[in-house]
Amino acid sequence: MDTNTSGEELLAKARKPYTITKQRERWTEDEHERFLEALRLYGRAWQRIEEHIGTKTAVQIRSHAQKFFTKLEKEAEVKGIPVCQALDIEIPPPRPKRKPNTPYPRKPGNNGTSSSQVSSAKDAKLVSSASSSQLNQAFLDLEKMPFSEKTSTGKENQDENCSGVSTVNKYPLPTKQVSGDIETSKTSTVDNAVQDVPKKNKDKDGNDGTTVHSMQNYPWHFHADIVNGNIAKCPQNHPSGMVSQDFMFHPMREETHGHANLQATTASATTTASHQAFPACHSQDDYRSFLQISSTFSNLIMSTLLQNPAAHAAATFAASVWPYASVGNSGDSSTPMSSSPPSITAIAAATVAAATAWWASHGLLPVCAPAPITCVPFSTVAVPTPAMTEMDTVENTQPFEKQNTALQDQNLASKSPASSSDDSDETGVTKLNADSKTNDDKIEEVVVTAAVHDSNTAQKKNLVDRSSCGSNTPSGSDAETDALDKMEKDKEDVKETDENQPDVIELNNRKIKMRDNNSNNNATTDSWKEVSEEGRIAFQALFARERLPQSFSPPQVAENVNRKQSDTSMPLAPNFKSQDSCAADQEGVVMIGVGTCKSLKTRQTGFKPYKRCSMEVKESQVGNINNQSDEKVCKRLRLEGEAST
């Protein structure tokens, strides 16, 4: 036994010593009886049980109750009887727990409080997720909802519901404001549109005043009806010498002048310097064909200009001034083309204008009667050229001063005077083709002829095309032979009809002289140098005066010439009244020829512009006699023009 005790002591010594810091709680029998009485009376109200016992604290009472209840349950399980029957005591249910201030997720449906809380949360979620179009209605429905559900569930539920309502209050007000802004902006836009519509209608109704005036001031102004393809109410400004696209594809005259009040304005507009940069095209196909023709002709001019560097430099310099000066009547050139650099079309236009100024001043173009052609000429080249007769109006004077330099550097060889005995084969055949077209195309083609004449011979042969003035090949070519045959046939026709006319006899003599000169293709070029030297003197005189001789023409001269220009602005159009237009064309040709012949006599004595302008007025009346005699030539022109299309 001692050994055991000694062994126990050894084991006790081996353990780590510990101290009891808290006195173990001891319940007396009296305290336990009062505890049981308080449970029957108050249940789990520990503070009241504390007051009933009087010697123990609430914490101690609760701890004692936990131990006591656990002991009772174990005893009941051992005995197999319910706790309430073993002891005459009913264990009170646990007190409901306090809801924490932070609403963390917990199981729903524990009591009525949580269900009301979930329903209020669902209401707030439905309102906040509504679309912008239904947000105001949802907000009104939320305002009508009773608040009994929200206010009866305690402090925490009230806080949550208020937060939900506040979120709803945040959204509809700015949405309402934004929608109001949108509505006001739409309303203002509609108001502006309504205010703009009468203005536009007023502009359309005032066609006879404002629209025509703007079209005269701005040459590249397109009426709104042109874009839609309706040309009936839009007057066309057809500059003299230019055949419009309308007459090529829509030959009816009533289409272009549908508005009766605008015919007089249109007729007067053709006499000004306002030109359409592009003829009106009624469809995309017409526009594509027009662009193809104009680009082909412009490329031809540019190729010849590039082969002659001096002519190209002069034409570029003149073209840089051309778009600004060609506006004519307008005080401000606010067109899109005015700010663009010189283009191919502008260079070609400047070259043509320079040649026109020279021929109008000196009359260096010996004119013969028009010959029949086999192809439709380039009548729709979009070059803003001025009027191509001798007498131009005052508006065209400023571009000529700048553009006469282009012709200086292009050799004037191919434009030799008709009075000299060594007119070359090139100029004769070129004039033959040029006279069969409008005055506009005549000037352009001879300019191209001059440039091609200065280029290489191999490139001359590549440019053989009768419709585009490529007939200036050597005299042995087939193109020139055909052209000469047609010239002889036409000369015989003119002799049959106009044998008694002195002017026509003189023209025929000139054609015979040109035909005889075809064999003298290698003649000397001394007279050409004299012409170019004289041209330099003339240009210096022009620049010193800063005015051209056309600006000194009297008003009645401009009226007579412009009346003939409006007649000759639409020749060679198929299915059109080609008889009248051809008669007018013949009249213009005779007028140019007579004026040229008379002015060449005074060429050797100096530069005399005033006599030339006055003589043209007298001799322009001579061409009226030839109107009836040229019907045969006009019919041949029309038939061959139709056959080539």
UniProtKB/Swiss-Prot annotation:
DNA-binding recorded as keyword: yes
PTM section of the record: Phosphorylated by CK2.
Localization terms from the record: Nucleus
Tissue distribution: Expressed in leaves, roots, stems, flowers and siliques.
InterPro entries listed in its UniProt record: Homeodomain-like_sf, Myb_dom, Myb_dom_plants, SANT/Myb, SANT_dom
Residues with PTM Phosphoserine: S6
MF-aspect GO terms: DNA-binding transcription factor activity; transcription cis-regulatory region binding
One Pfam family of this chain: Myb_DNA-binding
Stimuli inducing this protein: Circadian-regulation with peak levels occurring around 1 hour after dawn. Up-regulated by APRR1/TOC1 and transiently by light treatment. Down-regulated by APRR5, APRR7 and APRR9.
Disruption of the gene: reported phenotype: Shorter circadian oscillations. The double mutant cca1 lhy accumulates higher levels of JMJ14 but lower levels of ATXR3/SDG2, and exhibits damped H3K4me3 levels near the transcription start sites of genic regions.
SUPFAM superfamilies, alphabetized: Homeodomain-like (SSF46689)
Domain HTH myb-type: 19-73
One GO BP annotation of this record: response to cold
Disordered: region residues: 89-127, 149-212, 410-437, 458-500
Alphabetical UniProt keywords: Biological rhythms, DNA-binding, Nucleus, Phosphoprotein, Transcription, Transcription regulation
DNA-binding region, residue range(s): 46-69
One GO CC annotation: nucleus
Biased segments, Basic and acidic residues type: 149-158, 197-207, 483-498
CDD domains: SANT
Bias (Polar residues) ranges: 110-120, 159-169, 468-478
UniProt xrefs under Gene3D superfamilies: Homeodomain-like (1.10.10.60)
Function: Transcription factor involved in the circadian clock. Binds to the promoter region of APRR1/TOC1 and TCP21/CHE to repress their transcription. Represses both CCA1 and itself. May recognize the promoter of JMJ14 to regulates its expression during the night in a circadian manner.
Complexes and interactors: Homodimer or heterodimer with CCA1. Interacts with CCA1 (via internal domain); independently of photoperiod. Functions probably as part of a large complex. Interacts with CKB1 and CKB3. Interacts with LNK1 and LNK2.
Additional observations: CCA1 and LHY are only partially redundant, but they bind to the same region of the promoters.
Name this polypeptide is given: Protein LHY
Source organism: Arabidopsis thaliana (Mouse-ear cress)
Organism taxonomic ancestry: Eukaryota, Viridiplantae, Streptophyta, Embryophyta, Tracheophyta
